[in-house]
From Swiss-Prot:
Gene name of the record: tuf1
Location relative to the cell: Cytoplasm
Keywords noted in UniProt: Cytoplasm, Elongation factor, GTP-binding, Hydrolase, Magnesium, Metal-binding, Nucleotide-binding, Protein biosynthesis
Protein name: Elongation factor Tu
Keyword Transmembrane: no
Length: 391
């Protein structure tokens, strides 16, 4: 059969498998590819290549497949630490997750931890695959496990009562030992993923935002700010705000340039220079953002989930405590901040992931799910994500 051309006609969605070690995440990933993609065996997925994201090495396996309605990119990580790092750094963006729970064991510590992480990093939706159902003869026991999973999801503010839970067996699907628990269950799972996990809004449809990387003064024309448009569209003549570091100011974009050509607009993904009216070279700086008025506010205090690098990863050699003062690298710039650890957490060791409060010394254009690096003198020692804004 000739290899079919990749059609961009279907909406694209990024998902991943999460859950406790040995509950069957990788087997399920293999089973999905068997019916919806180019089959990848367990060993091919398990031998995940290492990648670097924000200075952190993470092993992740990527597979792709498609249903009648969508094209999926699916990420599976071999180790628990890889999951933690992946979710916090956003190395593989997740528009939704498939939580794999072994029916024979029920929810376990990493089940809980992955659900909490999904909540902290803002994974929009979860679908559950209750795996290894061929190992459980007792229907009441299955119901009990399902109830436990629903309660756990609700505890972490996911809609536990409405989340689809599909019962099946990834191994049965791979070995064709039971059509009902195997192929049928996998097809039901993907139907649930198709209908329950929302299609993400494309970056171009979101409100305009461009992190400012550089500022130039062009004699006779004014001030130009350059950067890569993160989302949305900016048209010549539109009003925008400059947010972060200093008081928010309004200005008008009087020109957009790309590769030395004048355009009438810049859009998500473009590297542009924007000419702005009535703003002096000294009034704007790297680290601020240009955005649609009112869409983003500057903040200094937030709650974050962070992963702290190990010594082997090039991180710190020693723990840190409350009042630790590193730099937080947001988009294009470092800002010093003070860390407050949660009650009961005395210190954070290299290799830990931690929920913490941060107070920056100057405000930054910020919203939930914004990611950052934690640095000491230009060296990355951690990665984090804004889980909620305090003020």
């Amino acid at each position: 059969m000739a290899k079919s051309k990749f059609e961009r006609t279907k909406p694209h969605v990024n998902i991943g498998t999460i859950g406790h070690v040995d509950h069957g995440k990788t087997s399920l990933t293999a089973a999905i590819t068997k019916f919806f993609g180019e089959f990848k065996a367990y060993d091919q997925i398990d031998a995940a290549p290492e990648e670097r994201a924000r200075g952190i090495t993470i092993s992740t396996a990527h597979v792709e497949y498609e249903t009648a309605n969508r094209h999926y990119a699916h990420v599976d990580c071999p180790g628990h630490a890889d999951y933690v790092k992946n979710m916090i750094t956003g190395a593989a963006q997740m528009d939704g997750a498939i939580l794999v729970v072994s029916a024979a064991d029920g929810p376990m510590p990493q089940t809980r931890e992955h659900i909490l992480l999904a909540r902290q990093v803002g994974v929009p939706a979860i679908v559950v695959f209750l795996n290894k159902c061929d190992q459980v003869d007792d229907a009441e026991l299955l119901e009990l496990v399902e109830l436990e999973v629903r309660e756990l999801l609700s505890k972490y503010e996911f809609p536990g009562d409405e989340i689809p839970i599909i019962k099946g067996s990834a191994i049965a699907a791979l070995e064709d030992s039971s059509k009902e628990l195997g192929e049928d269950a996998i097809r039901n799972l993907m139907d649930a993923v198709d209908s329950y996990i929302p299609t993400p809004e494309r970056p171009i449809d979101q409100p305009f935002l461009m992190p400012i990387e550089d500022v130039f003064s062009i004699s006779g024309r004014g001030t130009v700010v350059t950067g890569r448009v993160e989302r949305g569209i900016v048209k010549v003549g539109e009003e925008v705000e400059i947010v972060g570091i200093k008081a928010t100011t309004k200005t008008t974009v009087t020109g957009v340039e790309m590769f030395r050509k004048l355009l009438d607009q810049g859009q998500a993904g473009d590297n542009i220079g924007a000419l702005i009216r009535g703003v002096g070279r000294e009034d704007v700086e790297r680290g601020q953002v240009l955005c649609k008025p009112g869409s983003v506010k500057p903040h200094t205090k937030f709650k974050a989930e962070a992963y702290i690098l190990t010594k082997d990863e090039g991180g710190r050699h020693t723990p840190f405590f409350t009042n630790y003062r590193p730099q937080f690298y947001f988009r294009t710039t470092d800002v010093t901040g003070v860390v407050t650890l949660p009650a009961g957490t005395e210190m954070v060791m290299p290799g830990d992931n931690v929920a913490m409060d941060v107070t920056l010394i100057v405000p930054i254009a910020m919203e939930e799910k914004l990611r950052f690096a934690i640095r000491e003198g230009g060296r990355t020692v951690g990665a984090g994500i804004v889980s909620s804004i305090i003020e």
